[in-house]
UniProtKB/Swiss-Prot annotation:
Coiled coil: 11-38
GO terms classed as biological process: DNA-templated transcription elongation; regulation of DNA-templated transcription elongation
PANTHER family per UniProt: TRANSCRIPTION ELONGATION FACTOR GREA
InterPro entries per the UniProt record, alphabetical: GreA/GreB_C_sf, TF_GreA/GreB_CS, Tscrpt_elong_fac_GreA, Tscrpt_elong_fac_GreA/B, Tscrpt_elong_fac_GreA/B_C, Tscrpt_elong_fac_GreA/B_fam, Tscrpt_elong_fac_GreA/B_N, Tscrpt_elong_fac_GreA/B_N_sf
Any one GO molecular-function label of the UniProt entry: RNA polymerase binding
Gene3D superfamilies reported for this sequence: Transcription elongation factor, GreA/GreB, C-terminal domain, Transcription elongation factor, GreA/GreB, N-terminal domain
Protein name: Transcription elongation factor GreA
Keywords linked to the UniProt accession: Coiled coil, DNA-binding, Transcription, Transcription regulation
Family: Belongs to the GreA/GreB family.
Record has Transport as a keyword: no
Keyword Coiled coil: yes
Role, per record: Necessary for efficient RNA polymerase transcription elongation past template-encoded arresting sites. The arresting sites in DNA have the property of trapping a certain fraction of elongating RNA polymerases that pass through, resulting in locked ternary complexes. Cleavage of the nascent transcript by cleavage factors such as GreA or GreB allows the resumption of elongation from the new 3'terminus. GreA releases sequences of 2 to 3 nucleotides.
Length: 163
């Protein structure tokens, strides 16, 4: 089983979610019990909804617990360097269009494209890993190969200060 990188902050967020889900569990069980007491389960929408919620809740708890055993927790405040790696914020330029994009490389369980972070397992991140400023990378995309240049590499850590 390989380890999955995650930041300390990302790990804490999942711990909070797991705790919240476990606290929600008794309420869902109670809702099932109450719906069951209403009688005929074949036409009991409340029962069906509560059972569905229980299934989703238990699946998410199981998923988080199994992932936590695989995590390699990395403190973003302790990493720096001149090569792209987990935790780096990387600016790249599309060599054809000139468009610039900036991504922070995080683990798959905390990446959020809308917030500018991508998984280190994504095709773009995999092409960048180990590269330096000025290096050219090629990403296989649905529209074909895209050539980028790495413009800058920064390590901001959790305090937002560049190292």
């Amino acid at each position: 089983m390989s380890s999955i990188p995650i930041s300390v902050e990302g790990f804490k967020q999942l711990e909070k979610e797991l705790d919240r889900l476990k606290k929600e569990r008794p309420g869902v069980i109670q809702a099932i019990k109450e719906a069951r007491e209403e009688g005929d389960l074949s036409e009991n929408a409340g029962y069906d909804a509560a059972r569905e919620r229980q299934g989703m809740l238990e699946a998410r708890i199981k998923y988080i617990e199994s992932r936590m055993a695989q995590f390699n927790v990395i403190d973003l405040d302790t990493i720096s360097g001149d090569k792209v790696m987990f935790g780096a914020t990387v600016k790249i330029e599309d060599l054809e269009s000139g468009e610039e994009k900036e991504y922070t490389l995080l683990g798959p369980d905390e990446a959020d494209y809308a917030k500018g972070s991508i998984s280190v397992q994504s095709p773009v991140a995999r092409a960048m890993l180990g590269k330096e400023e000025g290096d050219e990378i090629v990403v296989d995309a649905p529209r074909g190969k895209i050539h980028y240049e790495i413009v800058s590499i920064r390590f901001l850590g959790t305090k937002g200060q560049q190292r």
